[in-house]
Design a protein with these regions (language model features):
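Short loop/turn motifs that connect adjacent beta-strands in outer-membrane beta-barrel proteins
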Residues: 37, 168-171, 184, 200-201, ...
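C-terminal beta-signal and terminal closure region of outer-membrane beta-barrel proteins
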Residues: 403-405, 409-411, 583, 600-601, ...
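Extracytoplasmic beta-strand/coil segments of soluble accessory domains associated
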Residues: 78-121
């Protein structure tokens, strides 16, 4: 017969002390507790389908309970996950204004969100967005720091984050929290309610939550209010070369204004002069968010009912709606807008190509109406011999309906720059010609005429059927114990559809893909897992277990994949566990990797021709090629962004990986209640899916005699992106940028990362309460990346530079990340302090006398205090209480810092009230 589910003794011991290696707690269980555990049901822990009465395994797992989440003081699970030391590199979230689309992601080992599998109760959900998981409904979070493709299939290369939701909840729990940044902005709030009831036959729980986050502007923080660059060891204000009164060059061959520019019409004198970066650049920070706003509402439920002896039906459901937006600088006429010679405001009477920031539009606003739905139904039970089984069907769907405001209609802006064409168009005639050589010259009517909203809709669906059987050999086991095993099958269907806006379909929205993307695939999987006790109860071996698993995966568009995993657990004495694992892994290409159409994108790159005449490291071949392109020896660019072409590749294959962990867990008898765990890890990925590195392609081309390298074929030049070219150059546009570099996802990259995870916990009864100490951390010894064969191998450990998994944005790969927690609590109150540390990082492009060669080490201090009164809990706290500001990073176009790696908002103070009945 089923009873209302309760966690095993081992799990309760583990989660009671929060984030420490779960296996660490098993060694400290007393003999009496071990005896009690025999009567506790078997449970499934992340990383294995074999159900156990404890949570020992060869794989390192960290467990966080609901109390850990509450002590962090965070309103959303995103911030909590990002603070876990095993996370590294770039992660989308509230700090990401450019490119996040409002979503929040996880990044174990710094290997990218696509290689970190996020689960809810051991099952996939369609979006992978952390915003879809409400704090109020989380019972615990299990983080598997090991490859797990054998257990969970594709994507679990770096590890797994498994959110276990509340199921057996009785009563009512209400929570309300309000946060305010130390600068008086960025208000965030959360209200949640969870209600549950149970009987002898079953239970039901429902949870509702609403979370709100308000804006913080870049202009409201000193470090981000103005873009800076370095010159001669000093910081100078800078910005974009496309400013509010236009930078331009003549398209007439031989004109004095065709070279040596760009040029501007001086806003004060009206005279034509050369562009001066120090005074003429555009400050895009004034129209950009630092912390992005959002509103998230969610409703989740779970229910189970015993329909027969040892047979239970269960149901899980969840719905989340997120309203989010990002704001960035106004569009600019980067497409090569031409002001004709007969335009009345043309200062030189020649056709000129102008880059003009459309500041009158107020900026580009990217808004998302995102809905995430999941429903799981199934049955589970026990056979007479104690074996357990379950079958389930999981349906998950997300819809992302976006609305971008402030996009430029290229056709209409071009009309307003050409008197002849404008006269032939009734709409243009009504608003009149536009003077792009003067700031604030666009009238509201012209803005309305020239702007076009973009409203694409993306939809993804995951359907998953699972059947599992697990048990042990009982009395027919080995002398050391019964052999545990699990086996199962899975069928999964994935589909994705992206429908662009009608304006994009006809090519009128600048920078927006104009073709729909649609694709689907399905797969069949089967797995088997075994845990064999080799030795037990001997003087030299308290326990020696061997585990193995194998999984077969058959996609309808790939060859069959076989992955394997092996593990060993050895306890020479009760207080010491030595463990090791070896696992294969793989990641299948996504539908967008396979089928997305080509689209234009602005991508940062390193131009090899910058000041090539005085560049001592430039070869004679490179200098000759730069000169052949018509570039002066002192060639400079306002900023380095290439108009590139990106799209899918139906021939891309799966990534393959191997991962290894070796470690130990020690609970010394001479220090009561102390547990220490250290694990070494190493992950290698071959054939990683990536696009050719833009900088590497351009460098390889210019380093070859007479542009003979095969890389040159990947540079389409200005014709590929429909913009005027630079006179005498086949690769550069009218401003001098290398453009039209094409790239499609291919299996060309390699990754190798290694390091150590360590956890320690200790508690002591002191006075009328208990003192708790916990330390968890990760030390990164290696993170090497090669973008493609022949490219330089980059070692990012302890450095900051471009993250290959984060859209070409700069992030920090700190060698050491730790969280130290001190807490003391009684029946009436508790207090806690969390110190979050990350070590210094060095600039990958360090140079003598450069201001930002190194960031320095960082420590954030979080404090909290709670008072308990009857059924109420009152909490006050602060995150980053000393208002530690992020480090300055030069020439980084996003906030002058590494916004994905550091706290950008500053100090946050909060209050929370919760009630339980």
């Amino acid at each position: 017969m089923f009873t209302n589910t309760k966690l095993s003794k081992a799990v309760r011991l583990a989660v009671a002390f929060g984030a420490a290696s779960t296996a660490a707690f098993t060694g400290s269980v007393s003999a009496q507790e071990a005896e009690e555990a025999k009567d506790v049901e078997r449970i499934e822990v992340t990383g294995s389908r074999i159900k156990r009465t404890d949570i020992e395994s060869a794989s390192p797992i960290t467990v966080f309970n609901a109390e850990d989440l509450a002590k962090s003081g965070h309103v959303t699970i995103e911030k909590f996950v990002h603070s876990i030391p095993a996370m590294n590199g770039g992660m989308n979230g509230s700090n990401t204004n450019n490119g996040s689309g409002g979503a929040a992601s996880a990044n174990l080992r710094g290997l990218g969100a696509a290689r970190t599998l996020v689960l809810i109760n051991g099952r996939r959900y369609a979006s992978g967005d952390l915003n879809s998981i409400p704090m109020a409904f989380i019972e615990r979070v299990e983080v598997l720091r090991d490859g797990a493709s054998t257990i969970y299939g594709s994507d679990a290369i770096a590890g797994v984050i498994n959110f276990i939701t509340k199921k057996n909840f009785e009563g009512v729990e209400l929570t309300a929290q309000y946060d305010l940044a130390g600068e008086g902005d960025g208000e965030t709030s959360r209200v949640g309610a969870t209600i549950g009831t149970s009987s002898d036959k079953g239970n039901v729980v429902i949870s509702l939550e609403y979370a709100n986050r308000n804006t913080i502007w870049q202009k409201d923080r000193d470090f981000s209010k103005q873009p800076f660059a370095e010159s001669g060891g000093a910081l100078i204000p800078t910005g974009s070369g496309a400013n509010a009164f236009g930078t331009w060059v003549s398209t007439v061959p031989g004109s004095q204004y065709a070279t040596g520019g760009p040029y501007v019409v001086d806003p004060t004198t009206g005279a034509v002069r050369k562009y001066a970066p120090a005074t003429d650049s555009y400050n895009y920070a004034t129209a950009s968010y630092l912390v992005t706003p959002q509103d998230v509402f969610s409703i989740n439920s779970a229910a189970s009912y015993e329909i027969a002896d040892d047979v239970k039906a269960f149901l899980e459901g969840g719905y989340t709606n997120r309203q989010s937006d990002q704001l960035m600088a106004a569009d600019a006429t980067f497409w090569g807008a031409t002001v004709t010679a007969d335009h009345p405001n043309n200062p030189i009477g020649e056709d000129v190509v102008i880059s003009r920031r459309l500041t009158e539009t107020g900026g580009r606003s990217f808004n998302q109406d995102f809905s995430d739905f999941r429903m799981v139904t199934g049955f589970e039970g026990f056979l007479e011999n104690g074996w357990s089984w379950d079958v389930s069907y999981n349906y998950a769907r997300y819809t992302d309906a976006s609305l971008d405001i402030g996009r430029a209609n290229t056709k209409r802006y071009n009309l307003m720059l050409d008197p002849t064409a404008c006269a032939e168009d009734a709409g243009c005639t009504a608003v009149g010609l536009w003077n792009p050589f003067q700031a604030d010259s666009l009238t509201p009517q012209q803005v309305a005429f020239g702007s076009i909203p973009n409203s694409p809709v993306d939809t993804g669906v995951t359907k998953q059927f699972m059947a599992n059987l697990t048990g042990d050999t009982g009395d027919f086991g080995l002398e050391a114990g019964s052999i545990g095993w699990a086996t199962g099958v899975e069928k999964r269907w994935e589909s994705y559809r992206s429908i662009p806006d009608g304006g994009a379909l006809i090519g009128e929205i600048y920078g927006v893909v104009g073709e729909p993307t649609e694709g689907a695939y399905d797969l069949d999987e089967a797995y088997a897992e075994i845990n064999v006790p080799i030795l037990a109860g001997l003087s030299y071996a308290e326990r020696l277990d061997f585990s193995a698993a194998v999984r077969s995966t058959n996609y309808n568009f790939l060859q069959s994949q076989i992955t394997k995993k092996f593990g060993v657990e050895y306890s020479p004495v009760t207080s010491l566990l030595v463990r090791a694992t070896y696992a294969d892994g793989f990641r299948a290409p996504s539908i967008t990797d396979l089928y997305s159409p080509q689209a234009e994108s602005n991508t940062p790159y390193v131009d090899p021709c910058l000041e090539y005449a005085t560049n001592g490291s430039a070869s004679a071949t490179l200098k000759a090629n730069c000169a052949a392109e018509g570039l002066p020896g002192n060639f400079l660019l306002p900023n380095n962004q290439s108009a590139t072409l990106e799209g899918g590749n139906p021939n891309v294959g799966p990534e393959e990986s191997t991962s290894t962990t070796v470690g130990f867990v020690y609970t010394p008898e001479f220090v009561e209640n102390l547990t220490v765990a250290i694990d070494y890890y190493k992950v290698e990925i071959d054939g990683a899916i990536g696009v050719p590195n833009i900088s590497a392609v351009i460098q390889s081309c210019y380093d070859s005699p007479n542009f003979s390298s095969a890389s040159c074929a990947l540079i389409g030049g200005p014709g590929a992106v429909d913009r005027p070219g630079l006179q005498g150059s086949k690769f550069r546009d009218f401003q001098g940028y290398v453009v039209g570099v094409t790239g499609a996802p291919s299996n060309i990259a390699t990754f190798e990362t290694a390091g150590y995870d360590f956890d320690a916990s200790w508690y002591k009864d002191l006075g009328t309460g208990r003192l708790n100490v916990r330390l968890d951390g990760t030390y990164l010894t290696e993170y090497s990346y090669q973008s493609q064969e022949g490219a330089d191998v980059l070692d990012l450990a302890g450095k900051y530079g471009i993250d290959p998994n984060f859209g070409g944005r700069a992030v920090a790969f700190s060698k050491l990340r730790t969280n130290l927690t001190l807490g003391y609590g009684t029946d009436d109150w508790n207090v806690s302090w969390i110190g979050r540390f990350q070590s210094n990082v060095e600039n990958m492009q360090a140079a003598p006398n450069k201001v930002s060669n190194e960031t320095g080490a960082y420590v954030y201090h979080d404090v909290q205090g709670s008072y308990f009164y009857d059924n109420l809990t009152f909490t006050l706290g602060a995150r980053n209480v000393f208002d530690k500001q992020p480090p300055y990073v030069s020439n980084n176009n996003d906030m002058n810092t590494l916004n994905s790696s550091y706290d950008t908002a500053g100090a946050y103070f909060y209050g929370r009230v919760s009630a339980k009945f």
